[in-house]
Regions:
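Helix-adjacent hinge/juxtasegments
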Residues: 58, 64-90
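Broad gene-expression machinery/nucleic-acid interaction feature
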Residues: 29, 43-45, 74, 98-100, ...
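Short beta-strand segments
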Residues: 27-61, 77-78
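Short, basic/aromatic recognition patches
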Residues: 3-31
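Structural motif corresponding to alpha-helix initiation and N-cap regions
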Residues: 17, 62-63
């Protein structure tokens, strides 16, 4: 039987797990892919927060993404680090992380509320009363927890 997750073909470009975690902590936007209608991939750009080895997203209470996750909890999440350009050259250094895992909808407010607050503070760390907004409006959002089964990171030099 073949392993579920393939090894990276260009293994010399692989990033260590700690670097993958750094990118997941610092990146601001990622792409969540689920198995959508008719078995087609459905990918959406999404804000997220990485805490305690898991990814958290918020979304509306209904829609394509939630329908897909209710049908199949398997998902893929991808982030790109900010590219760095080599001085006086065309080359860019780009790092990316791909996570495979399962997503569950957090239904207990004891789990949901702290994650919504953490997400808000990531994007509005100083100039916004995140906690008040979450307590006032948090019931209008779903909170998703992505448990990572496998991740890999890669550094490439692109021209």
């Amino acid at each position: 039987m073949e392993p579920v997750f393939r090894p990276m073909r260009r293994f010399k470009q692989a990033l260590p797990e700690e670097e993958c975690f750094r990118i997941l902590t610092s990146a601001y936007r990622g792409f969540l892919s689920v198995i959508g209608d008719g078995g087609y991939p459905y990918t959406v750009p999404i804000n997220f927060v990485f805490e305690d080895g898991k990814l958290y997203f918020h979304c509306a209470k209904e829609g394509h993404k939630l329908d897909a996750l209710r049908a199949c909890d398997k998902a893929c999440f991808t982030v790109l680090d900010e590219p760095e350009k080599e001085a006086d050259d065309w080359w860019y250094h780009v790092k990316s992380v791909i996570c495979f895992g399962r997503v569950r909808i957090l239904s207990d407010d004891a789990d949901r509320i702290p994650r919504l607050i953490a997400l808000g503070k990531k994007y509005f760390p100083d100039d916004y009363d995140t906690e008040a907004d979450v307590f006032q409006n948090g019931s209008r959002a779903e909170m998703l927890e992505f448990t990572i089964d496998h991740l890999s990171g890669k550094a490439v030099r692109e021209k």
